[in-house]
Amino acid sequence: VREMMIPLDDYPWVRIDDTLKYAVRVIEEAQLQVGRRASLPRVLLVFDHADDLVGIVRRRDIMRGLEPNFLVSQPLDERVKFFDVGVDPHLSELSANWDFQKVVKGLRDQSSRPVADVIRPIHTSLGPEDQIMKAVYEMVSLNESLIPVVEEDRVVGVLRSVDVFHELA
C-alpha cells in the first residue's frame, strides 16, 4: 500500500466546519500527480480542528448538500419534474415550473452550509505495509473508492481505487 498511496500532504482536504462553497473550490482547484499521470480527486478528506480525520465528502455529497430547501422537502418524483423542461430553440421562455432565480438563490443559500452536514464516515483504513489484495477486498466489500492509510494512529496518506485499478492493469 505504501508504494501506491498518495501522501497526505499531496491530497486535498477541508475542515469539518468549512462551507460547501469552500469545498467546491478546493475540489475544483485540486490536481493530483500520480506517477506520470495527472488526476482529479473525487473525494475530499475532512478533518476536525484537532487534525483528526473525521470523514470524507464526495463530489456528489456536495451536490446533494447544495440542493435548495424548497426542493428537498418534495418527493423525488416531484423534484425530477421540476427540471423536466423541454428545450426551447429560441430560449425565449422556460417552463412555468422553472424558476431559475429561485434555484440560484437556493444554491447560494445552501453553499454556506458546513461540510459536516454532508460528511460520510470512514468505514475502514489500511496500514502502509498491507498488501494490495487487502485493499482490493476492502474497496470491493465496502464499496469504497478511497481508503485512508494509517500508521501509528496517524493518517499518512490515502489509497484510491483508480490507482489500485491502474496498478492491477
Predicted regions and their residues:
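Tandem CBS (Bateman) regulatory domains
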Residues: V1-D10, R59-H123, V136, V140, ...
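Conserved beta-strand scaffold positions in the cores of enzyme catalytic domains, especially
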Residues: Y11-W13, H123-S125, V155
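The conserved cystathionine-beta-synthase
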Residues: V14-P41, M63-N69, S125-N143, V150, ...
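A glycine-centered beta-loop-beta connector
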Residues: I27, A38-R60, M139-L142, I147-V162
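Residue-level detector of functional hotspots within protein domains
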Residues: A30-L32, D48, Q101-V104, D109, ...
